[in-house]
């Protein structure tokens, strides 16, 4: 009999039941102190303040060479908080921010958190209609935007009467002469005047702030899921869920020390960007190297020039990782990534290149979702298995369930991954129906259904096996009906020597069954010989009913804003 009490307890059971959620074999990799540590009970701002109280002269942010200490950052946050309160922002209000991770964005997020307001972080690439919709959905009284988006913001003020527009410049915090060059380039054309953020703060002479008291499960951050099949959903996180990510990184034994440097190229409007790139980075007392131009070659150049101790990147930056591995790499302490994940061949290629350049590290993969803020399981330098997603964090539990019966499955069996974790979202914004479908409350525990397939081995390592939503029904030549897994086909394609990227979509035929169509980006050109080898490999490694009849060569793979393959934009036959 599975004991719900055992499932809720943060300890490894003495007996082996055969079920990961009960046995928790991953806990053997954590210290007793980590397992028993109490979760922080404070706001996001209070947490970074507390964790850096005695090291305020350390550098918090490095922005194009301009270094901002923790003391300076806290002062900037408090001044911005006073300005927001003077402008009428109160506890519980929502302010919409459309910006990159410049210092001003970071101080806005924590200033709003300090006074109990919520930051609604929206994509920089939204259309005018989408901007209006996301501002009005949360009833924002203030809209803060980066001036790089001026062309899209221009003209929407008339449709948002009563909303104050505040513009931020990516140049204001840059060192001279970069600041002078940048300011000279800017021209603003708003119909109604927008307020410059620097003036917004400077005109507020008061530094007195009415700090909001901590409330359990209080709203803090709204980010948006990077869906590939529909409109992104607003994901609401609390102070507790955001702090839980940072705290578990602290107690897990990741080897990230105060004063070390941490490269952050991921914008704050992604869950990973605000949670890991900003909040965890600051909570751990590291120096965040802010890289706001998400171009692969520039990220690679920054890694080589700045030599950050810790580099954590999304799947879109795989080429940057490979390009940045040059010379003696013994300075690197962490190279990690997640998101859409990488193939076994790509992972081994990265590891081999690291080792060739004198590093003892392996590339670390992990697993997370916007709904978790970021990470729920990860490999670590001290604890890893190649091709796995690592182990759950010390305060996190996992169970694998049968997608149809919802019964828990034992070790080694593939099913839907469900997590119980303190960094779980509160809900989907204004979407109780979808929230109820995603978060299951069972025997007093909340389990978030990921929609992803995986399994757990007897050591507690988690493996990704595909996506539940990408399972289709097809029919073999003999008429037998089978399940079709596009992810499996993609893995075979990605293992082909000539294939740089691969994607598979499924199209319905005239009798309502499904056929796979493969899209590939080749490393060099496109020849019939290459395609023949690819088709031969598919035939050798896949059952007949899974082999795509069509393999299309395309020049580049369409990506979502978070760097994942955008299946909706693949050309149709």
Question: What name fits each language-model region?
Answer:
Residues 243-261, 269-312, 324:
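Conserved AMP-binding/adenylation subdomain of ANL enzymes
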Residues 39-40, 57-102, 106-110, 127-132, ...:
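Conserved AMP-binding/adenylate-forming core of the ANL superfamily
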């Amino acid at each position: 009999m599975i004991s719900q009490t055992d499932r809720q307890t943060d300890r490894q059971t003495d007996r082996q039941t055969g079920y990961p959620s009960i046995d928790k074999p991953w806990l053997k990799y954590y210290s007793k102190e980590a397992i028993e540590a109490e979760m922080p009970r404070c706001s996001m701002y209070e947490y970074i303040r507390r964790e850096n109280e005695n090291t305020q002269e350390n550098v918090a942010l490095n922005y194009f060479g301009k270094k901002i200490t923790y003391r300076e950052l806290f002062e900037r946050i408090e001044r911005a908080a006073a300005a927001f309160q003077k402008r009428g922002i109160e506890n519980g209000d929502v302010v919409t921010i459309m910006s990159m991770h410049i210092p001003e964005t970071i101080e806005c997020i924590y200033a709003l958190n300090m006074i109990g307001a919520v930051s609604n972080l929206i994509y920089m690439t939204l259309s005018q209609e989408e901007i209006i919709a996301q501002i009005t959905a949360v009833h924002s009284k203030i809209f803060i935007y980066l001036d790089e988006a001026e062309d899209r913001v221009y003209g929407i003020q008339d449709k948002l009467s009563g909303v104050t527009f505040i513009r931020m410049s990516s140049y204001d915090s840059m060192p001279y002469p970069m600041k002078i060059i940048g300011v000279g380039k800017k021209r603003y054309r708003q119909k109604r005047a927008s307020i410059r953020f620097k003036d917004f703060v400077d005109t507020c002479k008061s530094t007195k702030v009415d700090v909001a008291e901590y409330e359990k499960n209080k709203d803090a951050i709204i980010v948006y899921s990077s869906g590939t099949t529909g409109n992104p959903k607003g994901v609401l996180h609390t102070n507790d869920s955001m702090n839980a990510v940072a705290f578990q990184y602290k107690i897990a034994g990741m080897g990230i020390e105060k004063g070390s440097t941490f490269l952050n190229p991921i914008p704050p409007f992604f869950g990973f960007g605000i949670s890991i790139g900003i909040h965890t980075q600051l909570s751990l007392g590291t120096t965040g190297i802010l890289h706001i131009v998400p171009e692969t070659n520039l990220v690679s150049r920054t890694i080589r020039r700045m030599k950050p101790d810790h580099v954590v990147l999304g799947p879109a930056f795989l080429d940057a990782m490979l390009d940045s591995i040059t010379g003696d790499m013994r300075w690197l302490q962490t190279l990690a990534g997640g998101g859409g994940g990488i193939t076994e061949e790509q992972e081994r290629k990265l590891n081999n290149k690291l080792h060739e350049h004198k590093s003892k590290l392996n590339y670390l993969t992990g697993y997370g979702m916007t709904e978790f803020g970021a990470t729920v399981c990860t490999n670590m330098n001290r604890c890893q298995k190649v091709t796995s997603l690592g182990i759950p964090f010390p305060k996190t539990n996992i169970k694998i369930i049968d997608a149809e019966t919802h019964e828990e499955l034992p070790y080694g069996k593939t099913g839907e991954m469900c997590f119980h974790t303190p960094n779980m979202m509160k809900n989907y914004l204004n979407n109780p129906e979808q929230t109820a479908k995603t978060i299951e409350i069972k025997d007093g525990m909340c389990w978030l259904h990921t929609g992803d397939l995986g399994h757990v081995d007897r050591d507690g390592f988690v493996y990704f096996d595909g996506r539940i939503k990408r399972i289709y029904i097809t029919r073999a030549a003999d008429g037998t009906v089978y399940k079709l897994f596009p992810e499996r086909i993609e893995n075979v394609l990605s293992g082909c020597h000539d294939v740089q990227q691969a994607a598979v979509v499924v199209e319905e035929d005239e009798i309502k069954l499904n056929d796979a169509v493969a899209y590939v980006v080749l490393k060099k050109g496109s020849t019939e010989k290459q395609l023949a080898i690819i088709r031969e490999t598919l035939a050798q490694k896949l059952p007949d009913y899974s082999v795509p009849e069509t393999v299309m060569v395309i020049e580049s793979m369409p990506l979502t804003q978070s760097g994942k393959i955008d299946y909706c934009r693949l050309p149709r036959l």
